[in-house]
């Protein structure tokens, strides 16, 4: 062999007879790469947290009161609408002796009943229109402007409906009992249907008045708490 030719090196392994040459051991990963792998896995698997603006734990009590306000408005809508319908359909004709000699009792002949029907219809329409605003307060209980607006409107509706219910209640009592000093005889002994409808309308309107009182108190307490 000449000195100019490169020498060929044949590796020799110390293995037992019948076994093949051992495989090469895997190269160890650099420390920086090994440390970066768990960090990357933690970064990809960690859940992302989004800020919850509309649903905060601190607003839980305010949201419950706002939801109660929404339910009370639905509950007040039924009696107000029933009072308006019952008053508007109060009409009865009483025949005496012949068909040509009749007595008639109609709601528009009594200003108090006409006022009750208009007030109940306005209150029912207001309650229906206020439901979307109340729903917004449920979703965003931190808003104070809508609460204050609803409080002012509820107070106005409370005064209007109370006046109509009180005026109609006085006429209903006079129709049932009469007045001996003024020589006013009770008419409910003859006009049973008319008195029944007007009495039911007065009861329904006072029920709506009571719910409006709860709405005003609840709204005032919520604003004071904020």
UniProtKB/Swiss-Prot annotation:
The chain crosses the membrane at residues 65-85, 113-133, 148-168, 201-221. InterPro entries: CASP/CASPL, CASP_dom, CASPL. This is Casparian strip membrane protein 1. Homodimer and heterodimers. It is found in: Cell membrane. Keywords: Cell membrane, Cell wall biogenesis/degradation, Membrane, Transmembrane, Transmembrane helix. It comes from Triticum aestivum (Wheat). Residues 86-112, 169-200 are extracellular. GO terms for biological process: cell wall modification; cell-cell junction assembly. It is a multi-pass membrane protein. The keyword Membrane applies. Its main location: membrane. Residues 1-64, 134-147, 222-226 are cytoplasmic. Belongs to the Casparian strip membrane proteins (CASP) family. Regulates membrane-cell wall junctions and localized cell wall deposition. Required for establishment of the Casparian strip membrane domain (CSD) and the subsequent formation of Casparian strips, a cell wall modification of the root endodermis that determines an apoplastic barrier between the intraorganismal apoplasm and the extraorganismal apoplasm and prevents lateral diffusion. GO terms for cellular component: Casparian strip; plasma membrane.
């Amino acid at each position: 062999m000449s000195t100019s030719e490169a020498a060929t090196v044949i590796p020799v392994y110390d293995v037992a007879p019948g076994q093949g040459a051992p495989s090469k051991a895997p190269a160890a990963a650099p420390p920086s790469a090994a440390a970066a792998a768990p960090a990357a896995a933690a970064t990809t698997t960690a859940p992302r947290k989004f800020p919850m603006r509309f649903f905060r734990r601190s607003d839980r009590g305010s949201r419950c009161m706002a939801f109660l306000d929404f339910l009370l408005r639905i509950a007040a809508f039924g009696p107000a609408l029933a009072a308006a319908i019952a008053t508007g359909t109060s009409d009865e004709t009483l025949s005496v002796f012949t068909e040509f000699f009749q007595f008639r009792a109609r709601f528009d002949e009594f200003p108090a009943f006409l006022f009750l029907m208009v007030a109940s219809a306005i209150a029912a329409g207001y309650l229906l229109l206020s439901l979307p605003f109340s729903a917004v307060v449920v979703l965003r209980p931190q808003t104070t402007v809508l609460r204050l607006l609803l409080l002012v409107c509820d107070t106005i509706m409370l005064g209007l409906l109370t006046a109509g219910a009180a005026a109609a209640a006085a006429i209903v009592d006079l129709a049932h009992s009469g007045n001996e000093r003024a020589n006013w005889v009770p008419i409910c002994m003859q006009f049973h249907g008319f008195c029944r409808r007007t009495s039911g309308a007065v009861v329904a309107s006072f029920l709506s008045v009571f719910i409006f009182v709860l709405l005003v108190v609840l709204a005032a307490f919520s604003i004071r708490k904020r």
